[in-house]
Amino acid sequence: MKKQKKILWKKGIHLAFSEKWNAGFGSFKKFYFPQNLCFLKAKLGRPVAWHRQVKHFQCNKGLHIQKTWIQDVPFCSKTKSGLATQNVSTLYPKVKRKDSKHFISSSRSLLKLQADKLLSSAKSLDHKYCREKSLLKAAPGLSANTVLGRANGHEPTTDPQASDFPMKFSGESQSPGDSGKTVVLNKHRKRVCHGCYQGLEHHRNRRPLIPKQFQLNQHRRVRASLMMYEKLSMIRFRYRIFRSQHFRTKSRVCKLRKAQRSWVQKVTGDHQENLRDNNTEGDNCNPVPSLEPKDPCRCQPYFPDMDSSAVGKGKNCHVPDGHTKENPVLDKEHGLDDTFPDQQNGCVAYNWDQSSSCPKWECTEQIHEIPLMEHPSSDKFSPETERALMALGQESGTSAVSDDREKLPVSGADKSVSSVDGPVSEEPAQNENFQMEEDGSLKQSILSSKLLDHPYCKSPLDAPLLCSEPKVENQMSGGKSSQTASPVDDEQLSTCLSGFLDEVMKKYGSLVPLSEKDVLGRLKDVFNEDFSNRKPFINREITNYRARHQKCNFRIFYNKHMLDMDDLATLDGQNWLNDQVINMYGELIMDAVPDKVHFFNSFFHRQLVTKGYNGVKRWTKKVDLFKKSLLLIPIHLEVHWSLITVTLSSRIISFYDSQGIHFKFCVENIRKYLLTEAREKNRPEFLQGWQTAVTKCIPQQKNDSDCGVFVLQYCKCLALEQPFQFSQEDMPRVRKRIYKELCECRLLD
């Protein structure tokens, strides 16, 4: 391995000192090969792969020798070109004859001879040209005759053109019979450029070894050129940027923009041309004042650089039928004042009419950014507009008009408008509303009715009125708040609330039955003032009080019933009512109308089902049921409450359920009980004629927790003979009322 490396190293040195390479450097004077340079086989045309270290060494050695020993050789020098071709002709047959991938090195004596020849030739070189200039001359495409060459300070010379160079690149078409070609591989930044040299062939006519002009690779858009000196890199970089697609597109767009005129320039230019034509046809001067202001102090109409309806060849110019774009004269029927009304959607119409014998030029200008602050109405001009029109009218009145000019038909409205030596009157602005109807389709395409309703199209004088309304409301609200400022401070209100809540806790054991109406009513009675605007403070005080008094020992005793706080807590929120609450409330109902109603205990039906009549026989020992008019029997089926009523006068057994459920066996059990009770009490009239009914048109619950509350409300309404005027939304209020009634041991109306 070491021996092979040594052989390759020697061959590299020999190749670097060979006269063929020196002739190449001396003749080209622009090429040096910093990376891979190898020969192709004549038949295969493939580059020879060198070892990496050998390539690096060969590159460095070649550069060093070329910089130190070889001096610049002018192009087309007969002695040097002959020497180069002679050396090439002596070396080329060896390469072609060997037909191997290794380079053929010369002997040590040949190497010395070639070195002596190079030294002698170097001494006789002409030092007139420096290396940089000679490189720029020989660079393909960057000769002294080009623009870039002149920019770098080079004068045009009579050197051979790049088109005479016998060099081909991989981009050119090559015949399959070409042989003896050298390929230059440029792998800088992973870009491979193949250049096939035909100058290394056996030159019988001793022509100089000159490369061809380079070409651009159209597919990759990368210029395939030989490596040049570092001083040419900046020129090549600038040239590449100059030829880039983005730069060319940008420059093309700039040229197009410069070539195109704005619509304002076109309009003014077209009018000036038309006026010049009219002047040549007429006798004296232009009847229409020029658009270019002669006096800087004189007001002239302003043409904004935006889409408008000005006459001319603008971008959005509308020309009526029967007139060409070059004709600035518009008749009455197709004039622009007929198409657009005055000041509609921010448009201001300027009318110049000198006399009945002169043509009339009417121009409408659309102003989007300048609102008319002085006159919000649509039939008046602004003062600045009137001054401009007055100046233009006076200027037009002084101009002479010939009699040979064509006269246009003018309507009565236009005749009243036209004046020779005065300003334009305000009448055409008012009459244009009637002339709009002639060309309504064109108007609707530009001026939409929806735009007129837009807030930006309204008069700016209306804005203060809109802005003043919230201020008035704020003042009124501020005055109301100042009037309702309560003289009662928070401390007094808190003290009063605390005393009232103490009374509620003492009477009801909790704040469950307390409602907002009760609190506000009590405060109004104390302070003779409405505290509805201070509800947040009141609610905060109640919450703090409830946190300090969470639970107390509160009990209710009524007859044989006793309720504690756990029983009363079932009435809070959406809790299920228990038997103690149902039974005690039924006792209150029964005591409210003792002669008519009898309320059975909630355990009655369960005892009847489990033990029969004998289990409940003693429950009615002191009561004659058949002397009552209504019997109320609550049915508790584990998780649901229902009600069975018995109307003794009509012998009807009814079933009430807040969910629409009908338990037939419950009704049958009650019917059997009544028959047995009639026999025991010796009441034969009640042994027959019993009927059962299911009541459906009654208030229904919409949750799963208020069935007990509905049953108690059914009982109360039936006992007091009141209609069912309640619903699910009334259940929170009904719960509070039941709580109060239980605590007070009486029914509240």
Curated annotation (Swiss-Prot):
Active site: residue positions: 640, 657, 707
One CC-aspect GO term: postsynaptic cytosol
SUPFAM superfamilies per UniProt: Cysteine proteinases
The biological processes this protein is annotated with in GO are: cell division; proteolysis
Which of UniProt's keywords are assigned here? Cell cycle, Cell division, Hydrolase, Nucleus, Protease, Thiol protease, Ubl conjugation pathway
The record ties this protein, via InterPro entries, to: Papain-like_cys_pep_sf (IPR038765), Peptidase_C48_C (IPR003653), SENP3_5_cons_dom (IPR045577)
- Locations of Basic and acidic residues compositional bias? 268-279
What is the top EC class of this enzyme, as a single word?
hydrolase
- EC number per UniProt: 3.4.22.-
Entry superkingdom: Eukaryota
Instruction: Please give the residue ranges the record annotates as the region Disordered.
Output: 268-288, 394-440
Molecular function GO terms recorded: cysteine-type peptidase activity
Q: Where in the cell is it found?
A: Nucleus, Nucleolus
Q: How does it assemble?
A: Interacts with CCAR2.
Q: Which family does it belong to?
A: Belongs to the peptidase C48 family.
The record's PANTHER family line, in alphabetical order, gives: SENTRIN-SPECIFIC PROTEASE 5 (PTHR12606:SF10), SENTRIN/SUMO-SPECIFIC PROTEASE (PTHR12606)
Q: What's its job?
A: Protease that catalyzes two essential functions in the SUMO pathway: processing of full-length SUMO3 to its mature form and deconjugation of SUMO2 and SUMO3 from targeted proteins. Has weak proteolytic activity against full-length SUMO1 or SUMO1 conjugates. Required for cell division.
Question: What's this protein's name?
Answer: Sentrin-specific protease 5
The protein's organism comes out as Mus musculus (Mouse)
Read off the lineage from the record.
Eukaryota, Metazoa, Chordata, Craniata, Vertebrata
